[in-house]
């Protein structure tokens, strides 16, 4: 043997498998070969292929035969002196003719009497059948204590550690331990929301710094801080910023408000530089709206010219058709003009909606509180409008969509 099996005792294989190796050699007696039908050196799968070994022949097990007249079967050494018959009958005292005077050990075995103690104690209760008794060092396999003893008498500590029940209802860690960068936090949604809020706080902080910087620049420009209506400049800057989108929205809804003096008084800010910036922004927005309107009108005029050209080409075909179709054609043209006008209005509305600032409150689009209440309560609709009285025959009519 060149390899040690017990790697824990000889991890570097220093023993070399000789007489001084870490494995004690098996005894070379014939008993071990007969015992379980195994060869002398039982080869494992890790010992390598068979080279000089012979194929291990299976030896028949020694069967325990019942006692016969010429060779009674021998019981185990710990059940030698018993009166339990070999064939398995109940216990009865042996015949007096065959009895020899019992030595103290046989008396203890047979009657459970202690030679030194003639009292009623635990040493009296010996098992009648020694087959019920276990050989020393063997485990108790049945009884009222369940399968096996709870604590082995030779073992001072339990084999399995006690289970910590506090960890039983914890969520299962499916991913196991990973590197810190690879592991997602326990509540990923909460983590993402925290990041979002942190970004919002940083943005607010940046806006405050910018407002303070603007106020400082305005003060350096020669405007005394006493002119400002609010207590401190940074807060006034923030208020102006929040007020700006509403004013812009008002200007775009009604351009005549741009030049009204009342609005200018109402909208007057502590820094005229900011007022000029607002006016510039408003003018730019109006210019953009006008330019967009002009572009849309020019595109629509080109489309109308193309339509008219195609209409002129189609005139000859229409003359060939029946005279009754002329009235329908005029109605179609009127409908087209109406659609074009509505398209123009929608285009203007879209152009206005395009320039809505992102910070605009959505309550403007809903309307006043009274309208909102009516809208929610459906008070402006009568009961017949909500649930129209339709005859039942019409409910089961299937509209014909083939034409």
UniProtKB/Swiss-Prot annotation:
Disruption phenotype: Knockout male mice are infertile and have malformed spermatids, though testicular size and body/testicular weight ratio are comparable to those of their wild-type littermates. TNP1, TPN2, PRM1 and PRM2 expression is down-regulated in testes of knockout mice.
Biased composition (Low complexity): 209-220
GO BP term, example: sperm DNA condensation
InterPro entries, A to Z: CCER1 (IPR027889), Coiled-coil_domain (IPR052696)
Cellular component, GO, one term: nucleus
Biased composition (Basic residues): 137-157
Expressing tissues: Expressed in testis.
Keywords of this entry: Coiled coil, Differentiation, Nucleus, Spermatogenesis
Record's keyword annotation contains Nucleus: yes
Regions annotated as coiled coil: 292-353
Record field: compositional bias (Polar residues): 261-271
Biased composition (Acidic residues): 275-346
Compositional bias of kind Basic and acidic residues: 1-11
Residue ranges of the region described as Disordered: 1-23, 51-70, 134-164, 202-241, 261-350
SS bonds (residue pairs): none
Subcellular location: Nucleus
KW Coiled coil (keyword) present: yes
Function, as annotated: Regulator of histone epigenetic modifications and chromatin compaction into the sperm head, required for histone-to-protamine (HTP) transition. HTP is a key event in which somatic histones are first replaced by testis-specific histone variants, then transition proteins (TNPs) are incorporated into the spermatid nucleus, and finally protamines (PRMs) replace the TNPs to promote chromatin condensation.
Protein name as catalogued: Coiled-coil domain-containing glutamate-rich protein 1
Gene: Ccer1
């Amino acid at each position: 043997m060149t390899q040690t099996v017990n790697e824990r005792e000889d991890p570097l294989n220093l023993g070399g498998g000789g007489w001084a190796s870490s494995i004690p050699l098996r005894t070379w007696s014939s008993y071990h070969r007969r015992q379980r039908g195994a060869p002398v050196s039982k080869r494992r799968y890790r010992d390598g292929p068979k080279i000089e070994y012979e194929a291990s022949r299976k030896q028949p097990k020694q069967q325990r035969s019942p006692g016969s007249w010429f060779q009674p079967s021998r019981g185990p050494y710990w059940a030698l002196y018993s009166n339990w018959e070999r064939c398995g009958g109940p216990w009865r005292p042996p015949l007096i003719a065959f009895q020899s005077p019992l030595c103290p050990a046989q008396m203890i075995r047979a009657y459970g009497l202690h030679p030194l103690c003639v009292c009623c104690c635990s040493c009296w209760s010996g098992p009648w059948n020694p087959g019920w008794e276990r050989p020393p060092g063997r485990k108790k396999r049945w009884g009222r204590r369940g399968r096996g003893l709870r604590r082995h008498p030779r073992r001072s500590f339990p084999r399995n550690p006690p289970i910590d029940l506090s960890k039983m209802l914890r969520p299962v860690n499916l991913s196991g331990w990973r590197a810190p960068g690879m592991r997602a936090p326990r509540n990923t949604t909460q983590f993402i929301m925290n990041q979002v809020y942190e970004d919002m706080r940083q943005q607010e902080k940046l806006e405050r710094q910018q407002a303070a910087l603007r106020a400082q620049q305005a003060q350096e420009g020669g405007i005394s801080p006493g002119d400002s209506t609010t207590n401190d400049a940074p807060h006034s800057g923030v208020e102006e910023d929040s007020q700006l989108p509403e004013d812009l929205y008002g200007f775009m809804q009604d351009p005549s408000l741009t030049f009204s003096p009342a609005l200018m008084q109402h909208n007057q800010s502590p820094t005229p530089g900011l007022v000029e910036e607002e006016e510039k922004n408003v003018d730019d927005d109006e210019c953009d709206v006008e330019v967009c309107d002009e572009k849309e009108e020019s595109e629509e005029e080109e489309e109308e010219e193309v339509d008219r050209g195609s209409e002129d080409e189609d005139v000859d075909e229409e003359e060939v058709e029946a005279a009754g179709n002329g009235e329908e054609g005029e109605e179609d043209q009127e409908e087209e003009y109406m659609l074009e006008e509505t398209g123009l209005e929608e285009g203007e509305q879209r152009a206005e909606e395009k320039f809505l600032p992102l910070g605009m409150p959505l309550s403007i689009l809903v309307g006043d509180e009274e309208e909102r209440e009516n809208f929610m309560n459906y008070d402006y609709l009568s009961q017949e409008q909500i649930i129209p009285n339709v005859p039942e025959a019409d409910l089961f009519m299937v509209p014909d969509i083939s034409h």
